[in-house]
């Protein structure tokens, strides 16, 4: 369910009641801290870009991984020239629907230092989507992942601004 759904609101109300119950049970002067690991955006069918249906996007991509909001693309032999060509083609195709598209080599310039362990799993090309856009590939993603309305993973403020609620009993 997306974060604007009735189901989402019902879960927030349950959480609110649980925190209120916790606040009644802990000793006076206890600080309760509630946070999340990421924000969310809602998407829909009109915001899905299907790689398998777009030959220009599928060309020279041998594997797809990551989140629909932050997709990792792999090119044959991890060739840097091929990665640069794929990145440019994706920039041309997606335009403003992508927040950032770059090669693994460019990732540290945009995302900060990339450790050795992370560098080993990063795609040859990284695609961070903007607004409510997602990249899907039914050859890789399950149907439930493709139709999921509430998504995260990109580097938009809605996804990286983390809520932090505190109260002192």
What are these regions (language model features)?
Residues 1-169:
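Feature captures the catalytic ectodomains and active-site-proximal regions of enzymes
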């Amino acid at each position: 369910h997306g974060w604007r759904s009735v189901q989402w609101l019902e879960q927030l109300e349950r959480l609110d009641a649980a925190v209120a119950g916790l606040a009644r049970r802990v000793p006076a002067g206890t600080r309760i801290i509630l946070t999340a690991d990421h924000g969310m955006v809602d998407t829909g069918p009109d915001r899905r870009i299907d790689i398998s249906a777009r030959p220009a996007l599928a060309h020279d991509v041998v594997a797809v991984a990551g989140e629909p909001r932050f997709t990792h693309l792999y090119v044959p032999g991890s060739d840097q020239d091929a990665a640069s060509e794929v990145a440019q083609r994706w920039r041309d195709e997606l335009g403003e629907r992508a927040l950032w598209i770059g090669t693994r080599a460019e990732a540290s310039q945009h995302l900060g230092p990339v450790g050795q362990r992370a560098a080993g799993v990063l795609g040859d090309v990284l695609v961070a989507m903007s607004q409510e856009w997602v990249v899907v590939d039914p050859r890789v993603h399950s149907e439930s992942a493709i139709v999921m309305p509430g998504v995260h993973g990109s580097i938009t403020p809605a996804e990286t601004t983390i809520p932090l609620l505190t109260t002192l009993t």
